[in-house]
Curated annotation (Swiss-Prot):
Keywords: Acetoin biosynthesis, DNA-binding, Transcription, Transcription regulation. GO terms for molecular function: DNA binding; DNA-binding transcription factor activity. Regulates the expression of the alsSD operon for acetoin biosynthesis. This is HTH-type transcriptional regulator AlsR. Belongs to the LysR transcriptional regulatory family. Residues 18-37 bind DNA. Transmembrane segments: none annotated. InterPro entries: AlsR, AlsR_PBP2, LysR_subst-bd, Tscrpt_reg_HTH_LysR, WH-like_DNA-bd_sf, WH_DNA-bd_sf. Residues 1-58 form the HTH lysR-type domain. The keyword Nucleotide-binding does not apply.
């Protein structure tokens, strides 16, 4: 049984006239009559009662007609959904992200994505950078938003965002009287950092700046995410360097200052498997690139 057999039957059942149905289908009557006869033989029951004067549906034919209509409707819906999925307008996109990506980078992209593709379900999972790479390779997430470096050649990487770092220090700290902080100011200060495994490049860059200045930083505490780091600064435990976007984490007990002689940049990248051809990824990358362009234009304007 082919799809056209159902279409032929529906036409005859609705017209109750083989001649009219044939014209509707742009075919001649004899082959149409033959196709309906073959359909009845395959189904194993009489679907249409024929006389010289009229055609009418049998009880079995009425039941079969209803199911034929539903079948064609479902097939049509299936075709539409398949096409929408292939175009990246339907489906599931699983995104892994580090917490710092939520300060200003990720939320507007998700908002724009949902606006353009409302039928796509987005699943967001907060995962560390190292584990994101594992989840990408296993196929458990489609996209990772994480910190460099990445070691796996199976992953495609695109720059997502770069943000200069500022110094976060307790509001009552004596250094808050200065507009900017030098590397020498940090020599004897207690330092809080994001753990090396959470953000290896930024961690090592800071260590290197201090060693070039002739001292090893006094790191008193490490944490895996900047929300906790800011909380520790607020408690007066020490000071830390954070992406300028982290200033959005409003805290009355923390003050931010520019850093002189220390050019630390926080970087995020977007990663996905090279063999992952999910069309939803392409749309995400495009929206991300547009967002970066708008951000750069806005920064240039200010």
């Amino acid at each position: 049984m082919e799809l056209r057999h159902l279409q032929y039957f529906i036409a005859v059942a609705e017209e109750l006239h083989f001649g009219k149905a044939a014209r509707r289908l742009n075919m001649t009557q004899p082959p149409l009559s033959q196709q309906i006869k073959q359909l009845e033989e395959e189904v194993g029951v009489t679907l249409l009662k024929r006389t010289k004067r009229f055609v009418e549906l049998t009880a079995a034919g009425e039941i079969f007609l209803n199911h034929c209509r539903m079948a064609l409707m479902q097939i049509g819906q299936g075709i539409e959904l398949a096409q929408r999925t292939a175009r990246g307008e339907q489906g599931l996109l699983v995104i892994g992200f580090v917490g710092s990506a939520t300060y200003e980078f990720l939320p507007p992209i998700v908002r724009e994505y949902r606006k353009k593709f409302p039928s796509v379900k987005i699943e967001l999972r907060e995962i560390s950078s190292s584990r994101q790479q594992e989840e990408l390779l296993k196929g458990n997430i489609d996209i990772g938003i994480l910190h460099p470096p990445l070691q796996h050649t199976a992953l495609h990487i695109e720059t997502a965002q770069s943000s200069p770092c500022v110094l976060a220090l307790p509001k009552q700290h004596p250094l808050t009287s200065k507009e900017s902080i030098t590397i020498e100011d940090l020599r004897d200060e207690p330092i809080i950092t994001v753990a090396k495994e959470a953000w290896p490049t930024l961690y090592m860059d800071f260590i290197q700046f201090c060693e070039q200045a002739g001292f090893r930083p006094n790191i008193v505490q490490e944490a895996t995410e900047y929300q906790m780091v800011i909380g520790l600064v607020s408690a007066g435990i020490g000071m830390t360097f954070v992406p300028s976007s982290a200033k959005k984490l409003f805290n009355l007990d923390v003050t931010y200052r520019k850093m002189d002689q220390i050019q630390l940049n926080a970087e995020w990248v977007i990663a996905y498997r090279k063999d992952n051809h999910n069309p939803l990824i392409k749309h995400f990358i495009h929206i991300s690139n547009c967002q970066q362009t708008r951000t750069k234009e806005s920064d240039a304007g200010t």
